[in-house]
């Protein structure tokens, strides 16, 4: 009797747990008796993955927090490597968390265990030398975006574009009224969303600029109301204090979380760069991307970052389809000037481009990822 297929997985944070859940579901179609084990969160565990360590043991944010748990994290990494070397899985899949997973993948591959890295690190943007470690550590990289695969192809590193899970989740036709109803917003309200980031340092720098920009827009377009999702109570308190100082009369409604619904409710959005820009594109919301960091971070980033654009919509399109205002260009005057053409217009050209890009990256990523695992197991890439 054949032994069931054994698949090792490591997710390092909540987003990886969601990806792992979808991947396990899709793999069960191919291998209904497969055994899954590794580092998992509640969603992966619910799909039958045995957690040798809980995801929470790795899920830390910030330099100081990582330092505080570094000893524990390194011990976990050593134990998981030793476990998989002693009990080799048929394949190992590291989900995101490259600082942790690439070392695991490298050690396992040295012991002839097949390895896949799911979610490309941003090597195309900065620290491009990491591509050589990735090449040694993995049999295949699974990339969400087409320009990522193009980068790997330049270095002859096996990579497969599988589409983006977020593009699978969001409908091609936006559901604005449904989103507004879920938030208790008026169906016919004119709404500008503001997303100044989720980290304290981001909100500290961008909050005042975004609020002053909104205040100026409010004077020019008095029909508009402003909606903001804040990731937690601390960021909400931070923004409210900034509002009292910079825009006390602004008609502002703050939501606890619910960033997706806020984005989908908006007629336009002002946001910091990051995944939010991709989500706004998929929600078909015209946007301005504005970003500013402290001077030292900017100087270091300018030396390291090797891309023309900072926002994912522009990177996917390989041209500027949304306005980007970074660092010295991130001013109230520039933001207002960039937002004005988006307000009260149908923006059909931008929205049609968003639809085209949505279709490009809407590929049923869970199914594609599972098929990639099957192909590597069968020595096809």
Curated annotation (Swiss-Prot):
The keyword Lipid metabolism applies. One of its GO terms (biological process) is lipid A biosynthetic process. One of its GO terms (molecular function) is phospholipid binding. Its EC number is 2.4.1.182. Pfam families: LpxB (PF02684). GO terms for cellular component: membrane. It catalyses: a lipid X + a UDP-2-N,3-O-bis[(3R)-3-hydroxyacyl]-alpha-D-glucosamine = a lipid A disaccharide + UDP + H(+). Keywords: Glycosyltransferase, Lipid A biosynthesis, Lipid biosynthesis, Lipid metabolism, Transferase. It comes from the Bacteria. Pathway: Bacterial outer membrane biogenesis; LPS lipid A biosynthesis. The keyword Glycosyltransferase applies. It is an enzyme of class 2 (transferase). Belongs to the LpxB family. Condensation of UDP-2,3-diacylglucosamine and 2,3-diacylglucosamine-1-phosphate to form lipid A disaccharide, a precursor of lipid A, a phosphorylated glycolipid that anchors the lipopolysaccharide to the outer membrane of the cell. This is Lipid-A-disaccharide synthase. The gene is lpxB.
């Amino acid at each position: 009797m054949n032994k069931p297929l054994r698949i090792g997985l490591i997710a390092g944070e909540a987003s990886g747990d969601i990806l792992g859940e979808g991947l396990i579901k899709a793999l069960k179609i191919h291998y209904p008796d497969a055994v899954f084990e590794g580092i998992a969160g509640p969603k992966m565990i619910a799909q039958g993955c045995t957690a040798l360590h809980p995801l929470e043991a790795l899920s830390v944010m910030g330099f100081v927090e990582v330092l505080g748990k570094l000893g524990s994290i390194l011990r976990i990494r050593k134990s998981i490597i030793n476990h998989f070397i002693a009990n080799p899985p048929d394949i190992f899949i590291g989900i995101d968390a490259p600082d942790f997973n690439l070392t695991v993948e490298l050690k396992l591959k040295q012991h002839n265990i097949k390895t896949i890295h799911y979610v490309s690190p941003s090597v195309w943007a900065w620290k491009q030398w990491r591509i050589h470690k990735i090449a040694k550590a993995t049999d295949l990289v699974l990339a969400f975006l087409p320009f990522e695969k193009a980068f790997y192809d330049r270095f002859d590193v096996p990579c497969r574009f599988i589409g983006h899970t977020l593009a699978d989740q969001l409908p091609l036709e936006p559901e604005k009224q449904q989103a507004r109803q879920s938030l208790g917003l008026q169906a016919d309200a004119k709404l500008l969303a503001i997303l100044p980031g989720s980290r304290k340092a981001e909100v500290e720098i961008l909050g005042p600029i975004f609020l002053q920009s909104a205040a100026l827009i409010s004077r020019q377009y008095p029909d508009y109301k402003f909606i903001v999702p804040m990731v937690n109570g601390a960021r909400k308190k931070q923004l409210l204090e900034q509002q009292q100082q910079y825009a006390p009369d602004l008609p502002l409604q703050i939501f606890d979380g619910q960033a997706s619904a806020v984005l989908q409710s908006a007629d336009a959005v002002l946001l910091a760069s990051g995944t939010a820009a991709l989500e706004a594109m998929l929600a078909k919301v015209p946007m301005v991307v504005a970003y500013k960091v402290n001077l030292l971070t900017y100087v270091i980033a300018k030396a390291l970052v090797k891309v023309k654009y900072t926002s994912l919509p522009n990177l996917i399109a390989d041209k500027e389809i949304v306005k980007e205002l970074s660092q010295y260009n991130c001013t109230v005057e520039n933001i207002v000037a960039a937002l004005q053409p988006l307000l009260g217009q149908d923006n059909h050209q931008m929205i049609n481009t968003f639809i085209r890009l949505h279709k490009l990256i809407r590929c049923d990523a869970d199914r594609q990822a599972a098929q990639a695992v099957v192909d590597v197991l069968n020595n096809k890439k």
